[in-house]
Amino acid sequence: MANTRSSSQLVDAALELIIEAGVDRLTLSQVAERAGVSRATAYREFGDKDGVLAAVAQQEIGAMIVATMAGFDPQADLTTQVTLVVTNALRYLRGHRAFVRVRDHEPHWLLYAGLPIGNARMNVVQTVAAMVAAAIPSPDPLALPPLAAAEVVVRTVLSHALIEDSALTDQEVAQAVSRAISKPAIS
């Protein structure tokens, strides 16, 4: 995605339209109109609906990672780190209007959306897990390789964000994730 004023306007407009009416009915023409740019500009910037959706996903996943890592202490123990990441991610997703709209009405977009990463397409779990794995300060306390541990975190968060009814509190979810990815304590 080009980082131009019009591309930013188009991404913001697409996000607004997703909040209002969802992804299925979204068109690039609507996005262009909402952004106040020509259809030609929209097509030049993104090519098609998938292009603008990938740009929205890239922007919003980046924002989620920033929000999730707020207050992260690389010197803290793994349980503290995982608890912070899991609870921040759940809070962020539950408060994200576009995520909630799509979760409630078009969850297939969350489960099967592909994001272009280099020459490959990765699903949301793969994309976020790769970002989380890169942020893991040390693999030493992990019972799994960093990417696998990150995938456990992402899949658990996504599961609890998609299906909110749970007997577990967010804190308990975070503690369960921490136990799942941590090496057992040596006594």
Segments from the language model and where they lie:
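Solvent-exposed, amphipathic alpha-helical segments
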Residues: 13-20, 63, 67-74, 156-160
